[in-house]
Amino acid sequence: TMWIGFGVIALWNIFKEKLNLNTNVAAIGALLLVLTAPLIMGFQNWDDHDRGSHQGSRDYAINFLESCEENAIIFTHGDNDTYPLWYAQEVEGIRTDIRVINVSLLGVDWYVNQLRYKMNDAAHLKLTFTPNMIKGNIRDYVPYVNNPSIDKNKYYNAKDIMKFISKDDPKIKAQTRYPYYVPTRKMSFPVSAEAVKTMNMTDAPDSLIVSDMRVDLRKASLQKNDLMTIDIIANNINDRPIYFAISVAPSAYLGFQKYFQQEGLTYRIVPVENVSGQPTQS
């Protein structure tokens, strides 16, 4: 832009001084000459840059949504994963019963608070943490602290762990230096037989279906988005189908990958453990 401006001034001086044109005519002539470059570029390159018929992103988003059962929750990761799905829902009205959750935004209080309300045809989410419990930087970082009273071989109900982390107990800070902490890396997520049946979770034989999904956290601490992911799964797994988009980074799986069942472009969390560690096929 700067060099175009210099070019206009130079041409204006040439027209004015060399061709003896008045100021207005010289300025118009210089401007017309300079405009030929972007006009030619526009005519020659329009077809190369026209995105009017490019629908790959839209089709990809619709495939994600159509991979889910009714009233589902799907975790996505980042803008490119999420915005096309929101477009399909908000603009084209496709699968508005699904709640799309961007795990990258779960560390932000205002975004989490939106999940407490119905969105289009998607019901609100059940959460342990109130708005004040996650306001601003509260619980942005929740470390794991070894607790001698905790049995290291036992899996504890994730709902109970979330309730423990939600407490604001001065005694905890006095004992650990932290206002809240994760007391165990072993969490269980009970799944009722009724939920398995009514939500058609899996076609696996009953002998392979577990009543408790057991997850081993490999992290030394939980960020707020990790905390909220666990809380959402713990509180909603018996009410709604829950999925991860296949494009989500493995670091966001939090150990659930051994319970993944691939359905279309998603991994659904089902109470069937994969010994191989690879998602089963539906």
Feature map (PLM): residue ranges:
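ER/secretory pathway lumenal C-terminal domains and tails of membrane proteins involved
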Residues: 1-71, 86-282
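Short glycine-rich, flexible loops that bind phosphorylated cofactors or substrates
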Residues: 83
